[in-house]
A protein has these predicted regions:
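Conserved small/polar residues in nucleotide/adenosyl-binding loops
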Residues: 246-247
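Residue-level marker of beta-strand positions
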Residues: 59-61, 78-79, 104, 139, ...
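Generic hydrophobic/aromatic pocket-lining and core-packing "Φ" positions
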Residues: 40, 165, 186, 239-243
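Hydrophobic/small residue at the entry helix of a nucleotide-binding pocket
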Residues: 160
C-alpha cells in the first residue's frame, strides 16, 4: 500500500508500507479526499520528523471499508470524516503512526466513538474533508466567547480565518472586520459574512478599526473599541501589534 511519508527537509516520498492489520476496536477507511494543510507544508519545509519518517495528511474523508466487532459509531459503506486526534499512537499526519495521504487509512480506537463522523447526505467528500480546518476555525470562536453584538476582528483570511468568520456569522455576530493582503481572500471574507475588509498594504489598520468600531479610553490613549481579536494569519507582527495598540 502507498503512503506519503516525510523523510527530512523537503524530502517527501510515496513509500510502500505494510497493509494495516486492524483489531476489534479499529476501522479501515478508503480515503476519497485529503486536504494539504499549511501544517503539512511547514513539516516538509522544516523536516519536522522525530528521527524517523512520518506519514502526512490529517484532513481526510472517505468511505468505511471495514469495522471491528466493537465499533458501533459507523458501518461498512458509511461516508465519514476522520478525527485526526491522538488515539494512543500520536496525532494523524503530524507525527503519529497514521496519515491520511494514503488509499486505505487505519483508524485505531474507532470504537471510542470520537474518530469517525458520518457525512450528511448530499455533501460530497471533497467538501467533507474541510471538516478539520472548519473545526479549528470554530474552536477559535469558541475560545473567544464572541457573542451577538460584539465587535470582532479576524486577522488572516486563509481557510482558518474564513471558517472563523463563517462561524461568527452563523452565531449571530455581524460586526466582523476581516484583514488580509489578498483581494481574492477579502472577497471571500465578505461572502462568508465580514461586514468590513481591510488590506494592510493600503489601509492604516488601527486607524480604520477606530473609525469602524469606535474608540475606547485607555490610560495611554484611545484604542479601537474592538471586543475580540482572532489571529489566523500566523504573522509575528500581528502578535506584537495587538498589545502595542492597547498601550
Amino acid at each position: 500500500m502507498k503512503q506519503i511519508m516525510l523523510h527530512g527537509v523537503n524530502d517527501w516520498r510515496l513509500d510502500e508500507i505494510d497493509d494495516p492489520v486492524p483489531g476489534p476496536r479499529d476501522a479501515l477507511v478508503r480515503i476519497s479526499a485529503c486536504g494539504i494543510c499549511g501544517t503539512d507544508v511547514s513539516y516538509v519545509h522544516m523536516g519536522m520528523t522525530p528521527g524517523h519518517p512520518i506519514p502526512l495528511g490529517h484532513e481526510m474523508a472517505g468511505v468505511v471499508e471495514w469495522v471491528g466487532a466493537e465499533v458501533t459509531c459507523a458501518s461498512v459503506g458509511d461516508r465519514v470524516v476522520v478525527c485526526p486526534s491522538d488515539a494512543g499512537d500520536g496525532p494523524m499526519g503530524t507525527g503519529g503512526a497514521q496519515g491520511g495521504l494514503t488509499p486505505l487509512l487505519f483508524v485505531p480506537e474507532a470504537a471510542n466513538g470520537r474518530r469517525l463522523f458520518k457525512v450528511p447526505d448530499g455533501m460530497d467528500l471533497v467538501t467533507a474533508a474541510l471538516a478539520e480546518p472548519l473545526a479549528v476555525g470554530m474552536q477559535s470562536v469558541n475560545q473567544s466567547e464572541a457573542k451577538p453584538g460584539d465587535k470582532v476582528v479576524v486577522f488572516g483570511c486563509g481557510p482558518i480565518g474564513l471558517f472563523a468568520i463563517a462561524t461568527l456569522q452563523d452565531r449571530g455576530v455581524d460586526d466582523i472586520v476581516a484583514i488580509d493582503f489578498s483581494h481574492a481572500r477579502l472577497e471571500l471574507a465578505k461572502e462568508m459574512g465580514a461586514a468590513h475588509v481591510l488590506d494592510p498594504s493600503r489601509d492604516d489598520v488601527w486607524a480604520e478599526l477606530k473609525r469602524i468600531h469606535g474608540e475606547a479610553p485607555f490610560m495611554f490613549g484611545p484604542t479601537p473599541a474592538t471586543d475580540v481579536y482572532i489571529e489566523a494569519s500566523g504573522a509575528d507582527s500581528v502578535i506584537g501589534d495587538v498589545p502595542v495598540s492597547y498601550t
